[in-house]
């Protein structure tokens, strides 16, 4: 009986993990942003710093830019680190991108860093101008409760449903070619520069928050490789007439993207969690009860024309903003604000629940090591965040957690700002 229960708990936990994802844009959209600026802005910037790069090397760099564009979301997926994603979304988000760029040493690391800059532009813009405004349009009851802006923290389920709906609509309209799906799945991760930048900005080594980084990346890729075919299947089922009208002669076999497990492992290896009984049960539950309990977040919700317009406007604005940021990099004048990715607003205490919670988690983790890896810059940032303790900080809701936060804060104030282990490596 215990074995049977554990097998049922596994798929439930998997879906709950996926349902926690706070996505302004999907993996497809994040990577499409890279393609939109590649020839005019991104490739010339790479060639300016590395003028001898060959076309083959640039293709490899393109794959690393894809990886950078989605890396901040990796922690939302199974067998990864949610703390990694929360930190890069809510704590020193701009500083982390600038550190990636500054720490990059070769073509691939530079491309990866500039890809991560695209994620910054997309999330800070996409939530504020797109999803947060579109959700209340599609869900009138949420508008009545929260007003004209509904954040992910307000209602995670609506955000996830609507983002999937945007994806399906874009896939149905032929925004992506089959070759693009293959390239998207083949994203590369510049692990060394990511590790250096992360330790520099957060005072925490990535090995201390990831059980196995390579395994986490492999599972991320494998999840994406399964998600893309599912999007094409749903798009065909729901928008078949429109697809056939826009592409005469198209068939289901031609439209639906397929990547067999054998082909996947031949190209990308076997470093991922194999789909056993638990994964099969997850798929069965999602098909049978998509609107019940934790599975309700995975139900499809098509965007209204107005919501879709908001999404496209935010996407176009993101492209413009990203190109402007790349121009700043080119001129050596990039100065990013530490913004909350879910709202697009400057990070400050009491502004957003998830930011409050993440600062508290980082403070607690650093305190366990007596702040020995806390740089002067990180120390100043944390103290500035907690400068006004009268702010409506979400951590206060749990008296025990708040006491722990205050104790750690007092300990940090007493700590001397001196060179740290994380920065001296």
Residue spans of the language-model regions?
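N-terminal, motif-rich segments that launch catalysis or mediate targeting to/interaction with membranes
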Residues: 23-111, 124-208, 223, 237-242, ...
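N-terminal signal peptide c-region/cleavage motif recognized by signal peptidases
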Residues: 19-21
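Short, linear, compositionally biased motifs with a strong N-terminal bias
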Residues: 12-15
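Bacterial N-terminal signal peptides that target proteins for export
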Residues: 1-10
């Amino acid at each position: 009986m215990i074995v049977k229960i554990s097998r049922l708990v596994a798929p439930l936990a998997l879906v709950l993990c996926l349902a926690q994802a706070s996505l302004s844009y999907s993996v497809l959209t994040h990577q499409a942003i890279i393609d939109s600026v590649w020839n005019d802005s991104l490739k010339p910037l790479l060639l300016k710093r590395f003028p001898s790069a060959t076309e083959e090397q640039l293709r490899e760099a393109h794959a690393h830019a894809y990886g950078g564009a989605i890396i901040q979301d990796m922690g939302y997926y199974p067998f990864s680190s949610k703390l990694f994603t929360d930190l890069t979304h809510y704590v020193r988000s701009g500083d982390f991108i600038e550190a990636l760029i500054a720490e990059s040493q070769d073509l691939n690391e530079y491309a990866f860093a500039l890809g991560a800059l695209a994620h910054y532009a997309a999330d800070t813009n996409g939530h504020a101008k797109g999803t947060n405004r579109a959700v209340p349009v599609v869900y009138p009851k949420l508008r009545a409760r929260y007003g004209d802006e509904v954040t992910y923290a307000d209602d995670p389920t609506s955000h996830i449903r609507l983002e999937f709906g945007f994806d399906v609509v874009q896939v149905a309209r032929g925004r992506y070619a089959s070759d693009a799906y293959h390239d998207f799945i083949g994203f590369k991760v510049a692990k060394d520069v990511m590790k250096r930048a992360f330790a520099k900005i957060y005072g925490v080594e990535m090995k201390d928050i990831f059980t196995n980084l390579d395994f986490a990346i492999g599972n991320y890729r494998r999840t994406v490789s399964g998600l893309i075919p599912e999007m094409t299947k749903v798009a065909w089922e729901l928008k078949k007439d429109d697809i056939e009208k826009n592409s005469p002669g198209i068939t289901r076999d031609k439209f639906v993207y397929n990547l067999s497990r054998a082909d996947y492992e031949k190209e990308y290896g076997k470093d991922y969690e194999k789909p056993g009984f638990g994964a099969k049960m997850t798929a069965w539950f999602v098909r049978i009860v998509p609107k019940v309990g934790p599975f309700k977040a995975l139900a499809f919700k098509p965007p209204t024309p107005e919501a879709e317009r908001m999404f496209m406007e935010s996407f176009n604005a993101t492209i413009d903003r990203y190109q402007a940021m790349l121009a700043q990099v080119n001129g050596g004048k990039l100065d990013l604000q530490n913004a909350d990715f879910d709202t697009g607003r400057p990070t400050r205490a009491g502004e957003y629940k998830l930011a409050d919670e993440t600062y508290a988690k980082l403070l607690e983790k650093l305190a366990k090591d007596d702040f020995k890896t806390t740089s002067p810059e990180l120390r100043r940032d944390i103290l500035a965040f907690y400068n006004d303790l009268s702010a409506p900080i979400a951590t206060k809701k749990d008296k025990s957690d708040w006491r722990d936060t205050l104790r750690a804060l007092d300990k940090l104030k007493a700590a001397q700002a001196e060179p740290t282990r994380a920065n001296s490596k």
